[in-house]
Structures are given as C-alpha cells and as structure tokens.
Amino acid sequence: FINYATTLLAAADASVGGKTAVDTPLATNLIGLFNQPEKVYLDIAAWKTLPQRQLSSGMAETIKHACMADKEMFEFLEKHMEDIFAGDREACEYIAKKNCQIKYAVVMKDEKEQGLREILNLGHTVGRAIETVSDYRLLHGEALSIGMVAMTELAHRLGYMTEEEKTAVKNLLEKAKLPVEIPEYIDREALVKKLYTDKKVRDGKLRFVVEKGIGGIVEFEEGVFATPVEEAVARDIIMKMK
C-alpha cells in the first residue's frame, strides 16, 4: 500500500513506521500488525486546510521528536512556530523532513519495538491513558502534550532534566496551542488505573521512557530505554498537575 499523509499528525507519526492498528475502548494501538508501505507521500499543502486544533495535534508529535532526538530542531520550533502555523513552505518542509528522518532512523534499527523503538513512546504512558479516559474528546496530540508535561516532571525528579529544560518543553507546547494541564472532567483515579494498559508494562510494573535534557533519551542500561516507575510516583505527578 501507499501512505499519503495529508495532516501534520500523519506526517509526523503514522506515515513512517509500519504500524497498522486499531483503537478500542480498552486502549489505543494494542491490536494490529507491522506492515510497511511501499511509498510515503507527505502533502504539506494540505496542512493549510486543517483547523488549528488538528495542526496543533500534529505539532505535539513533532515536538516529541525534537525532545528525544534533536535539540537544533527544538530551537527551530521555538523560533518558527508562527511560520509553521502560517503555512510557510520552508518551515513546513523542514519539520516534515525532520520528522521522517528521526522516526525512520529509529524504526530501521528496531522495526518491531524490541528495544530502541520504545523511545518513540516518549510522553505516551500518560498520553495514551488520558486519551482513552477522555473518551477521545482529546485529540491524540492534545493528550500527548499533557503526557509530555507529566514525563518532564518525572525526568526532573529523576535528575535528567533541569527546571529550565522542563519549563522550555512546557512553553513550547503552549506555543503550539496545546493543553498542558489535565482537564477537570478527567477522573484522575481512572487515569492512574488506565496507565496499566500501556504496552510498555512488564510484570505488572509501569515503565516510562524518560527525556534527557533537550534532544536526548535516557538509556538505563544497554538497549533498555524504559524504566520501572512506582505507581505512587506516577500518581503523585498526576495528582499534582493542575
């Protein structure tokens, strides 16, 4: 098949990687298979037709890529967010190529998520849980944005991000017109329970991918990019988020 991406979210996320999955009431992305497209086309002209909310949703995955792998890209987004939203071709081409390059580099080393590919789940432990608990009222990128804020707090507590770096990520998400707080209608106890449907859970233990500074990921031991986190810690972070 050919993947023709007409949204920023598809360009940043689904177009490269080969995951073909379905969402269920239980959770997202648990039922599916790996099937690589023969070709991928990114139609950045179509981005101009998107509502602001949809464009922002795609920007969350773009920011995630910058956070995990490319500080220069992060700084570009800080300077050119308005240009991207205005449809500036050069800025849009830059992020389209960067998204593909970053994700392709990971997927080609670990197509079926045996280790390295877990880094693409940065922010998704809380993000996917809140997306489901919201009954999909939150778009994927909106939920991911909140998950990124939770992740940076964890990274800060573990000593991998400074307060300034944590704030920089939050500020960039806000600049992209993304939510950074848990909506009042979300049942936080239900959110904590939903964390356990995450595909990174092992032996009943929550596991998180953790950012290192801006543009890096913590490798906890050789080939291991997710670390167990006690429920009490995850709960405390969630309960203290506004």
Give the residues covered by each predicted segment.
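Short glycine/serine/threonine-biased micro-segments
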Residues: 15-16, 30, 56, 121, ...
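C-terminal charged capping/lid subdomain of soluble metabolic enzymes
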Residues: 60-62, 160-242
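Active-site segments that bind and position negatively charged phosphate/pyrophosphate groups
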Residues: 75-190
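A generic hydrophobic-helix recognition signal that picks specific residues
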Residues: 29, 36, 116-117, 206
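Residues in well-ordered beta-strands of folded domains
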Residues: 23, 100, 209
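Structural motif
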Residues: 49-54, 89-90, 137-140, 201
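A glycine/threonine-rich phosphate-anchoring loop and its flanking beta-alpha core
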Residues: 1-82
